[in-house]
Amino acid sequence: MKRVFLWLIFVLAFHKLLAEKIGDIASVVGVRDNQLIGYGLVIGLNGTGDKSGSKFTMQSISNMLESVNVKISADDIKSKNVAAVMITASLPPFARQGDKIDIHISSIGDAKSIQGGTLVMTPLNAVDGNIYALAQGAITSGNSNNLLSANIINGATIEREVSYDLFHKNAMTLSLKNPNFKNAIQVQNTLNKVFGNKVAIALDPKTIQITRPERFSMVEFLALVQEIPINYSAKNKIIVDEKSGTIVSGVDIIVHPIVVTSQDITLKITKEPLNDSKNTQDLDNNMSLDTAHNTLSSNGKNITIAGVVKALQKIGVSAKGMVSILQALKKSGAISAEMEIL
């Protein structure tokens, strides 16, 4: 039987052992990237550009030539050396005029390849319609698997800044990346302990309002806040990718004793010691597996998802079969952790 490999990735999910910095689990509201987009032309393609049937490309070429005082009808242009593209980029917070940002280019016509071409100067707009950057540059051979998209490192220059006065603010808001009542209160109490009462107040499971002490500027205060360690409570969760067979799980997630059957495989999960020593294999964490009867024992201790997966691997269950068994365990109530199926 062909062996099917299942990649099992264990991430720490201990509620008491996760020590994080506040800056790792929370962001500052208002301090974020802004998305930019633009429409432009890639020139210099060796016959791999859009065909003459792409009317918007031919019209764009005509408009570009007219901007340099060359007038020609779009119907008279037969070039295959030009491709119409969309350019996207992220404008980071506090970026200044003259700073460079990376851009991503994607063909929108019927070009065969945009590799080796040159992006003509293209304005990049934000959702407010204003131009914030100008993009231009040569497209070097990058991803050979996709000839219709490319990245240009430092391919755009920032022309307009997003105004944000952080220095004179007295209060800001922190937003937890993963909403949790316990974590919100933990951040509140930790900040009040470090800086004094009433510096922080949790408004909901995601939001903590902070007020800077008078002895700090807001920049100094946020710099200190982000470096403060905190005991972070992570939610027990299992993520299953049915297509690839990948399982991401916390190592301490408990599986209660049960008998589960999926397709032609039956697995008994128990805390009772095994009697059949002849067919018993010792697994990690004091777990034993009776391969003759497909019985997994934790020898009186809690059974974890890690042990269950290792047992299934030992008895030759396929990746698809493992996913089915885990789903069955969740539906039966043997696993209380949240499960997300991709």
From Swiss-Prot:
Keyword Nucleotide-binding annotated: no
Q: Does the keyword Signal apply?
A: yes
Annotated GO molecular function terms are:
structural molecule activity
User: What range does the record give for the signal peptide?
Assistant: 1-19
Keywords per UniProt: Bacterial flagellum, Periplasm, Signal
Chief localisation class: periplasm
Q: Which GO terms describe its cellular component?
A: bacterial-type flagellum basal body, distal rod, P ring; outer membrane-bounded periplasmic space
The UniProt entry, under InterPro entries, shows:
Flag_FlgI
Which GO terms fall under biological process for this protein?
A: bacterial-type flagellum-dependent cell motility
Q: State its location(s).
A: Periplasm; Bacterial flagellum basal body
What biological function has been recorded for the protein in this entry? Answer: Assembles around the rod to form the L-ring and probably protects the motor/basal body from shearing forces during rotation.
Family indicated by similarity? Belongs to the FlgI family.
What is annotated about its quaternary structure and interactions? The basal body constitutes a major portion of the flagellar organelle and consists of four rings (L,P,S, and M) mounted on a central rod.
Could you tell me what this protein is called?
A: Flagellar P-ring protein
Q: Which organism is it from?
A: Helicobacter pylori (strain G27)
Gene of this entry: flgI
